[in-house]
Amino acid sequence: MKGLVKKISAPGLWMENLPIPSHVKDDEVLIKTIKTSICGTDVHIYKWDAWAQKNVPVPLVIGHEFIGEIAEFGKNVKGFKIGERVCGEGHIVCNQCPNCRMGRKHVCMHTKGLGYHISGCFAEYFVLPAENVFSLPPSISDDLGAIFDPYGNAVHTTLAFNLIGEDVLITGAGPIGIMAAAIAKQAGARHIVITDVNDYRLDLARTMGVSHAINVNRESLDNFMQSLGIKYGFTVGLEMSGHPDGLKTLTEKIRHGGNIALLGILPPATSIDWNLVIFKMLTLKGIYGREIFSTWYQMVHLLEIGLNLAPIITHHFSVDNFEKGFEVMLSGQSGKVILDWV
């Protein structure tokens, strides 16, 4: 079978001919891949930057965003059938730590990541624990199923705090930030403002129905707030950029007693004015992945009541042309990029 492998400790990926997994354990499922989506994490691995060099074993099949169908399952697996369309949770948990035993698996203390700690989904077939598999209703397209992982990040972050009638500032108009803006609108926020320095991404946000998309290199956020009647500051902030300036902006523009959820991965030495956090009594909440599986059901329900994410998928490539997919991702001129496996 075909598989995209980080073969050696160097930039790039390699298309390899791999054996189809032949031993499916009693509690596992063998999945035939239909589509995968390229994540920013995959780009880090492709570039082989400092984060990837530190965290990713070599050689490794990468990838964690997928839709596929069940090809085989172990004898203990119940509730699935051959040919069923599925996606899945890419965080493999231990089921033994205190958080897992209390039902809080999204904060497992020993989480392993599909495609960057253990063998991933960028292959024609791959194995996943049955407890991580999520069946998709027919109403959800293959394309949307392939991006359920990042969509779940957006849902988890956006709904971390009450949004009904609130004013929301999102720093970072990458695909997850843009999806977060659409989710916030669906969830009843009053004003939603998203900031970035990439005009392509801001235009994509507008295509997704975000009316307040600001290039902070050219436009004044203060003036924009004034035009919207936001006198005391935003009540909720979502940090999606992973850039120190994004966090700085949020601590300055969120009103006293406001809430900030952080998904973007900031540099380790990022500084913050803790006096603003303390004296404004701000609440900061880190977000990693999705709540297992409550976020997943929210994802389905939001789509069923009209959330439209289709425009966030901007490019499709055959997996044989995966290099072009990564080039588009590296250009910054894309939303989500899909690789077709069948």
Swiss-Prot record:
One of its GO terms (molecular function) is zinc ion binding. It is found in: Cytoplasm. Gene3D superfamilies: Medium-chain alcohol dehydrogenases, catalytic domain, NAD(P)-binding Rossmann-like Domain. It catalyses: L-threonine + NAD(+) = (2S)-2-amino-3-oxobutanoate + NADH + H(+). Disulfide bonds: none annotated. The active site is at T41, H44. Its main location: cytoplasm. One of its GO terms (cellular component) is cytoplasm. Pathway: Amino-acid degradation; L-threonine degradation via oxydo-reductase pathway; glycine from L-threonine: step 1/2. GO terms for biological process: L-threonine catabolic process to glycine. Binds 2 Zn(2+) ions per subunit. Keywords: Cytoplasm, Metal-binding, NAD, Oxidoreductase, Zinc. InterPro entries: ADH-like_C, ADH-like_N, ADH_Zn_CS, GroES-like_sf, L-Threonine_3-DHase, NAD(P)-bd_dom_sf, Zn_alcohol_dh. Zn(2+) 2 binds at C94, C97, C100, C108. The record marks D149 as: Important for catalytic activity for the proton relay mechanism but does not participate directly in the coordination of zinc atom. Its cofactor is Zn(2+). Its EC number is 1.1.1.103. Zn(2+) 1 binds at C39, H64, E65. PANTHER family: L-THREONINE 3-DEHYDROGENASE. HAMAP family: Thr_dehydrog. Belongs to the zinc-containing alcohol dehydrogenase family. This is L-threonine 3-dehydrogenase. It comes from Protochlamydia amoebophila (strain UWE25). The lineage of its organism: Bacteria, Pseudomonadati, Chlamydiota, Chlamydiia, Parachlamydiales.
